Amino acid sequence: MRYITHIIAVIFIMLAHSASAQSGGVVGVAYYDVDALYDTIPSRFYNDKNYTPKGKYKWDSQRYRQKVEHIAQVIDSLHMPIVALYGVENEAVVRDITAIVGEDYAYIHRTQDFSLGLDFALLYYGDVFFPEEVTSHHNALCIDGYIGDCPVTIIINNNSSSLGVLLNRNEYKVEDRAIIVLGKQRAESTSRWQLSDVMSEAEATGRGTVVYYDRWQMRHRIATNIRNIEQCNVYIKEWLLDMEGRPKPTFRGSKYYGGYSTSLPIYIYFDKLLDFSTKKL
């Protein structure tokens, strides 16, 4: 089974187009679940004691720094003007990431009301995306802004019910604008809002973002009403995988592997002159 998994991963690499090449008329957006990137300082508001120097994972400054460098490496490799992250503990972690990436990213971060203490962040080029309003909700973050002259709503989501609440709350905004939903969601929960699950084609060919019982699963998805999509896929590089062809994690169980994440990033390219549905959602 390990051999089969590795072969699938090799095929995966061959099929996935590089997400690093980007022309002037195309915009790329990526999503990455960084898998519990905590700092080393104990929190007073939630239980993160496992991710402290004396905790279960012996999460010291060296391990923390290596993880930050790994995430920055992935972001640099993606070379995307907009990158959504889930799984960062706080704004200080986001600052540490943006301080060492090769590109000059601005960022948006909001503290989430979540028992694990893990937040969302949006990294973006300030000359590509122009945010105007940020709405935070339990397990979701909504950023309204512009790409060029086109109004765009980006929702980073970790729960399908949160997505529905946000879209209902902001119903007056979602007419005549491009909508991009990134993260964990069910296809049926986005289709009711006339958003297309653009990861379904990759999923049908056996690709996914995580390996579960030796099978790829598309645990993270992208849904949108944008029509002129150039490319949408799972981002994979050989160095993101372990010897068995699975995403190389920081931990597997309590054993330290010093990897990147249990998940692979996903991405979408679309024409900068956005073509999107004008139907009321």
PLM features per residue range, with description:
Residues 1-24:
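Bacterial Sec-dependent N-terminal signal peptides
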Residues 22-29, 38-41, 127-130, 138-158, ...:
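Beta-strand-turn-beta hairpins that frame and shape the catalytic cleft
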Residues 19-100, 104, 273-281:
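N-terminal, active-site-proximal structural segment of metallo-dependent hydrolase catalytic domains
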Residues 22-25, 76, 100-102, 114-116, ...:
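Extracellular/periplasmic catalytic domains that process cell-envelope and extracellular macromolecules
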Residues 55-62, 79-85, 109-110, 159, ...:
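Second-shell loop/turn segments in exported
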Residues 88-157:
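Structured beta-strand-rich core segments of catalytic domains in phosphoester-bond hydrolases
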Residues 21-22, 171-178, 186-281:
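Metal-dependent phosphoester-hydrolase catalytic domains
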Residues 29-34, 71-94, 155-158, 162-192, ...:
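Active-site beta-strand/loop signature of hydrolases that rely on acidic residues for catalysis
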